[in-house]
Regions:
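Non-transmembrane, solvent-exposed regions of membrane trafficking/translocation machinery
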Residues: 1-231, 235-239
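Extended, hydrophilic extramembrane loops/domains of integral membrane proteins
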Residues: 230-231, 238, 245-281
């Protein structure tokens, strides 16, 4: 239970709770705006050619080329080689250039999605690859270069999601409608945490308008993924198996019980018109 009181200080309120929830977790819930957005996605098959072209262009840019690697032994520059006249000799090999893959060096596992014949294993999958958090700034820089960004549709936005792997992001290609999502969470009327086969999920329910919009959105995206973004953070991108009617949907994503519980609180409360900031806790 929450108790909200007006503060004597302008622009401030006091929020009290009888929960034993840790303060950092409570502050995250309290300061969440609760903005929910649903996006269609691009499949890897739709943008694979653009990614290969981006990697090629980056590899030809002088600032991203790898240095040449010599085939001579290390420290050979001060050695003298004497060959008898008429003896078989091997001409010094020319320097070779190391294979240059600037984009795929940081966008990992993309190329592993192709079989030995160069065909995509799952062309409808929307996950583009993984990126180490330490390399994320480099990947963002590459994708924002004019020569690279123009290769992709104007409606495409690359989104980042914490993966189950340590210090790694999953990279997903979102499809926007002139920068906007396909649907928002304004028609969500309730949200609750449920357990399904031992997994923690969040079940949401829409009003009649939202139910109709959700049915239409899922009907047009069968065998594709829909991404859910909360407060600007990608949280899941489930694959749509069939049209979903009835105004209900389950959100799954390997959530812990705390994550699923917090998400249900945020979604069930609706979006706030402004973002709160904690100035003091007691």
């Amino acid at each position: 239970q929450l108790t909200v009181e007006k503060s004597a200080q302008w622009g401030c309120i006091h929020v009290k709770t009888d929960s034993v929830m840790p303060v950092p977790r409570f502050e995250i819930i309290l300061t969440s705006v609760g903005s929910v957005e649903f996006y269609e996605t691009y499949s890897i098959g739709q943008i694979a050619t653009s990614l290969f072209e981006a990697n090629r262009i980056l590899g030809e840019m002088p600032e991203y080329k790898k240095p040449k690697t010599s085939t001579l032994p290390q420290n050979s520059s001060n050695q003298n080689y004497i060959v008898e006249e008429g003896a078989n000799s091997t001409e010094p090999e020319e320097d070779v250039v190391e294979i240059n893959n600037p984009l795929f060096d940081v966008l990992m596992s993309f190329t592993s999605q192709f079989d030995e014949n160069g065909n995509l294993i799952n062309p409808t999958y929307c996950q583009i690859g993984y990126c180490a958090k330490a390399d994320s700034a480099t990947l963002v820089h590459y994708l924002q270069l004019d020569a690279i960004s123009r290769l992709f549709p104007g409606s495409l936005v690359f989104a980042w999601m914490n993966s189950g792997r340590d210090n790694m992001y999953e990279i997903i290609a979102l499809k926007t409608d002139r920068g906007l999502p396909a649907m928002t969470g304004e028609n969500i009327v309730s949200a609750k945490m449920v357990q399904n086969s031992g997994n923690h999920e969040v079940q949401i329910e829409f009003n009649s308008e939202g139910a109709n919009n959700w049915a239409s959105l899922t009907r047009h995206n069968i065998d594709k993924s829909l991404a859910m973004v909360i407060d600007g953070n990608l949280v899941t991108y489930p694959r749509v198996m069939s049209e979903i009617t009835g105004g209900k949907a389950s959100i799954s994503g390997n959530f812990s019980i705390e994550e699923a519980s917090d998400m249900s609180l945020i979604l069930g409360s609706g979006a706030l018109p402004l973002k709160l900031r904690v100035v003091k806790n007691e």
